[in-house]
Amino acid sequence: MQPDLFSKASKQSAATQPKEIPDASDPSARAAWLRSELNRHNYAYYVLDNPIVPDAEYDQLFRELQALEASHPELLVFDSPTQRVGALALTAFPPVTHSVPMLSLGNGFEDEDVLAFDKRVSEGLNSREEVEYATELKFDGLAINLRYEDGVLVQAATRGDGATGENVTANIRTVRAIPLRLHTNNPPKVLDVRGEVMMYKADLAKLNARQRDAGAKEFANPRNAAAGSLRQLDSRITAQRSLRFFSYGIGLLEGADMPASHSALLDWYAELGIPVCSERAVVRGVQGLLEFYKATSEKRPQLPYEIDGVVYKVNRVDQQLQLGFVSRAPRFAIAHKFPAEEALTTVQDIEVQVGRTGAITPVARLAPVLVGGVTVTNATLHNEDEVRRKDIQIGDTVIVRRAGDVIPEVVAFVPERRPASARPFIMPSSCPVCGSPIVRLEDEAIARCSGGWVKCAAQRKGGLLHFVSRRAMDVEGLGDQLVEQLVDKHIITTAADLYKLGFRALAELDRMADKSAQNVLDALEKSKRTTLARFIYALGIRHVGEATAKELARHFGNLDALLQASPEQLLEVADIGPVVAASITAFFTDAMNIELIEQLRAAGVTWPEHVVENRPRPLAGKTFVLTGTLPTLSRDAAAEKIEAAGGKVAGSVSKKTSYVVAGAEAGSKLAKAEELGVTILDETGLLQLLDSDEQD
């Protein structure tokens, strides 16, 4: 079990906390407080490998101290955090003195920072031409120096304070991506490879699942997991965890010529068998830098690992040497950081929301905070057990994360900032919407409102929104606000009531004009012509998603056969187990659900009869994953062709995946397929496979 380094850091630093935080009116006191605060965070981040604030808050404090020292030079002291790289090494591992210091990079946060960097570089080189830059990713992991002597890995050390790190050779030898011997017959006498040890997001999920099963502490993010794994005293534990490595720089080099450029250095590394990230480019001028930043930002959610920015380096080594270094960073490089995906805020309250199936979900109401470029005021806490496990209380200061389009989540609370007035969340005993009892089955993590859609307006609204959604009945114009009005004004109760709506009832609603009302009626009329699979999915049967609805339609051929199916017959359908079969049976034995189905049929909802084919389907048993943009087929069209031939379309790549169909700008799914050796097809290959199967 991991030691609780979080609380350890809190206890150690408690004495350094002033009773009152000085403000800018007293520059000397403010600078002293900033130095103390940054040193405290440095210790938690670099030494304990368990940061107690997000990077964005640390960066803000660091820049404030830099500005204060610039405007008041007399406040600059030799041991200021602005004059050093990191923190001291633990004594648990032998210290290692780096032959060439491992410096940090300066940070840029806005386009203007990049423009200023390019201007400084051009002036430093006295160049009127656009400078050539190497661009690469800024990984969110642990910086490492790998020393090779005569081609053999002899030592690995952490960055530490930049001058002295920790010897973690035994643990690094367990990272399979790192070669123990370079792939060359003519190795340099000494080569120091600089790079980052990290953990992929999927590997973190697997590790945390094992941690939960063992009753051990989970890791908040991939960086903490990588750092905690690499700094295990028992290397056998490290060997059980999937760590990765990418190289990005060089320290000492003896017995070989230095490559002429940074891009050539990485190409050389790749030839030596040292992992190099493919997400890099050589560009010219500031426009090339910003285009790389934009492209990387767009593909960031699909990457299999965490990054917090990109790095720009003057590509030519002779120009790097000409520009030189400042006290803590090279002049020839800068990190262009993304908007923070983690931030600190406070939990003002914890309320519960009711979903369409009655699921009761605790939601944290947060003091507004900017995360990933979006103001976040709410974050899901998933279920009661999750709240207890993370020990989130009302009044806590918490770390909130928002990555890409992912729903904001509360990662952890900050123990040292918990106020005396904090109070735990208590799950209500009755539904906040309809007052029905909240129940929770023994084998389920989710508590549910027992009122059902008849009693509970929240379940009615959720069920109706699901019914009209694009992949269900696909009724354009019926959004959240309109459905809410229709339910709250008691105009509709069930999905069948939608098809009884009149023009005047719609036109008189808030924010509805005559044209909008007619558009909704036209969309409802159009939706009556659907497919059996869409209709089954639209009913909102618990545990029945799109794929299962398609399998049910394909297997039974018509709705009446499905309505009469026994649990044993349902179990004959692909991918349906006892839990799903029981849920389907329960739905179709409920008299109110049968009445709803008959009302929908009476309203004119219809679909083509599906003929059950007895001949074997050629792609039966094959699982496909679609990624990227195909030249002519939309993803839906490609999926329909695959499913019509009996194949199954999944959302993620695994060892069970038969084919990955990749188009332009394919992301992490393609990389995962290559890693697992899954067969990769382009659109032409898919169509050829379908054609050959049809001929067979």
From Swiss-Prot:
The active site is at K138 (n6-amp-lysine intermediate). InterPro entries: BRCT_dom, BRCT_dom_sf, DisA/LigA_HHH, DNA_ligase, DNA_ligase_AS, DNA_ligase_CS, DNAligase_adenylation, DNAligase_N. Keywords: DNA damage, DNA repair, DNA replication, Ligase, Magnesium, Manganese, Metal-binding, NAD, Zinc. It holds the Pfam family BRCT. Its cofactor is Mg(2+); Mn(2+). GO terms for biological process: DNA repair; DNA replication. Residues 614-696 form the BRCT domain. SUPFAM superfamilies: BRCT domain (SSF52113), DNA ligase/mRNA capping enzyme, catalytic domain (SSF56091), Nucleic acid-binding proteins (SSF50249), RuvA domain 2-like (SSF47781). Its EC number is 6.5.1.2. The keyword DNA repair applies. One of its GO terms (molecular function) is DNA binding. Belongs to the NAD-dependent DNA ligase family. LigA subfamily. This is DNA ligase. It comes from Herminiimonas arsenicoxydans. The lineage of its organism: Bacteria, Pseudomonadati, Pseudomonadota, Betaproteobacteria, Burkholderiales.
